Design a protein with these regions (language model features):
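Carbohydrate-active catalytic/glycan-binding domains of CAZyme proteins
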Residues: 1-201
């Protein structure tokens, strides 16, 4: 496994990745790069036939019976947290525990593959309490994420909020909420440009 930080001292926003390198066992029992050093070359020549993969679709629609391989749930099969068949053409997720839970989150995610990316979702949600929320997250793990979500305020009106978790610290960069009135259908977007993230609605 490897990581590709954007700068020498920054985080690896693409997470852990699989890499291939030619290695040898050293006299002291450790794997070392065959050509020495600590940074492997970007490309290797191998004597294998080319195997082209189908490109991952840019847009996901849910007129399907099961999740495609590029969409993942977090530790729980989809049929325990949602459905692709209850409402044709939609992915339905059932409310469960919070985004910080290690046990039962209702999350469907797509891995970030590039340092620059954009994701947009169309979401329909009917929160009844302050504790009910659904939205779009840029998620590294349960201790590090950005979360744009819809919830309800004290008066029962729908609002958008942002939650940021950085280790053990939580904060709301909006210092409050954005009222969206009675709207239950909303488009949410995350735009990632290396170390910069912007949310839109």
């Amino acid at each position: 496994l490897c990581g590709r930080p954007i700068t020498q001292r920054s985080r690896c926003i693409l997470g852990r990745e699989t890499c291939i390198a030619q290695v040898v066992w050293s006299d002291d029992g450790w794997l070392r790069l065959k050509d020495g050093g600590v940074v492997p070359p970007k490309e290797y020549s191998v004597n294998l036939p080319e195997h082209k993969l189908e490109p991952i679709p840019v847009k996901d629609t849910f007129n399907i019976k099961e999740l495609p391989p590029h969409l993942n749930t977090l530790r729980i099969p989809l049929d325990e947290i949602g459905s692709l068949t209850e409402r044709e053409g939609y992915l339905r997720l059932y409310g469960n525990e919070s985004i910080t839970s290690w046990n039962k989150q209702s999350m469907v995610a797509r891995r970030l593959q590039h340092h620059n990316a954009e994701a947009t979702i169309k979401m329909e949600f009917y929160p009844e309490t302050l504790q009910q929320m659904a939205g779009l997250t840029v998620f590294y793990d349960t201790y590090n994420f950005f979360y744009l979500y819809m919830s309800s305020d004290e008066m029962g009106h729908n609002v958008l909020r942002i939650c940021v978790r950085d280790g053990l610290k939580f904060y709301n960069p909006l210092n409050g909420a954005i009222s969206i009135g009675e709207h239950s259908e909303v488009y949410l977007r995350a735009k990632i440009d290396k170390l910069k993230l912007n949310f839109y609605y």
